[in-house]
Structures are given as C-alpha cells and as structure tokens.
Amino acid sequence: MVQSIERTMKIIRVLISDEKQAWPISDLASATGLPISTLHRFLDSMIQYGLVEQEPVTKHYKAGYTWMEIGFTLHNRINFRYVARPIMEELAQEVEESIFLSVPAGYDSIPIEKVESPLKIRIDENMGERIPLTIGAPNKAILAHWKPEEVRKVVAAQLAPALQQPFLDQLAHVKETGYAISCGEKTEGTVAVAAPIFSYGNQIVAALSINAPSFRVTEDRMSFLIERVKQKAATVSAKIGGV
C-alpha cells in the first residue's frame, strides 16, 4: 500500500511540474524511474478517478481536473470559516440576533461557527450537532442547491410520502428567492432566516443564518433580516470564489 502511494505521488509530482503540459509515456517513465508497464497500470486507475487525463490524439498524459476540485474543496474547508467569522460578527451587531454558519455533512448539517446576539434573550445551538437536512432554514438553503437526484434521496429518507412534494415546492421557492425561512422547526418559539454560501464553480458549501425568538420578528423586521442575511452570505461567497 505504501509503495503504491509513493508511486502515485511520483507520477503526480511529475505531471504537475512546469516542465511539460503533457507527458509521453516514455518521458514519464524516465522522470519517475518507473517501468512503462507499471506506469500504464497506475495511469489507467488514475484516469478512472479523473486524477489523470490522456490526450486523445497524442496519447500524452496530464494531471486531471479532479485535483483542482480537491484543492478548491480543501481551501474552502480550511479558510471559509475564518473568512465568514468577521462578517458574522458584523451581521450580529446589525440585527442584534444570533448568527450561525452551517455546513452539509452527509444527509445532515452541522453548525460550525456562531456569534451570539448581544441581547439577553437569544437563541443558542450546540456546535457540532447533526441536524437532518429537511429541518430548518439553513438546511433548506443548502438542500435547494443540491442536484435533484441527491435531493430526492434525502427527502425520501427523511420525510413521509405525503410531505415530500410540499417540501420540494418549498425548496424550489428557496432557490428562486435566494433565502429560506423556518418557524419553530427545530426549537419551538424560534425563527430562522438563512441564505446559501457558494464557492468556486457555484458549489454550495454552507448556509448563513439569523436565529431569533419569534416574538421579536415582525413582518417588517423579517424583510430586514432577509435582506441582511442575503447580503452577508453573498459577501462570504465572493471572498471564497463563489458568485
């Protein structure tokens, strides 16, 4: 296993070097010190996973775009939480409510960052708690931008048949308007307003939400909260390479 990893890394390091855009198999063998028969075996497996591409005409090899996707994903996971934090603090001061950052985790979401409301009566959530994706505004903001086939799997797993189409209709509205609202879905007496956060390639990576006691959210204030959470989510998206 260790030897296979070492050989794979040798191949990748050569393919991503600045020396050539694409490599003939003979040059790749010289650069890696690996036999051509071994190279063919490794390259065939790597092509299946998009880690390597073979040019159709020349048959030369180059690094695949999967590496770019992996790099962007890792970059976002490492950095976007820290990018979001000061923006969340600004939002908490503007609206005087608790602000949360949630990320998808399988068919659930996990709150990974929060800024508490400066007011005495405020909403709290447990960081790291798994919440089913069909519950709450942040999750609707995330799920509305998943691929339809994945959405159907989540909905089928978490909702009774009679509830599935109404929920899908909600998601369509969320995607169209750019925000989601929930009232007491997770915690009675609370309201949440959320907007999606996107990274490179318009990939949904998180949701930003405002959570408030329902008695503080009038119709006029709801419009204000929607406008602010959408604007701040868009700011985070822009800073991590999204739309």
Predicted regions and their residues:
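Short, basic/aromatic recognition patches
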Residues: 84-91, 153-195, 234, 238-239
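Sensor-regulatory modules in signal-transduction proteins
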Residues: 197-200
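Short, structured helix-loop boundary elements
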Residues: 2-5, 25, 60, 64, ...
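Juxtadomain coupling helices with adjacent low-complexity linkers
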Residues: 164-172, 188, 206-243
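N-terminal helix-turn-helix
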Residues: 1-75, 234, 238-242
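Amphipathic alpha-helical effector-binding/dimerization core
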Residues: 58-154
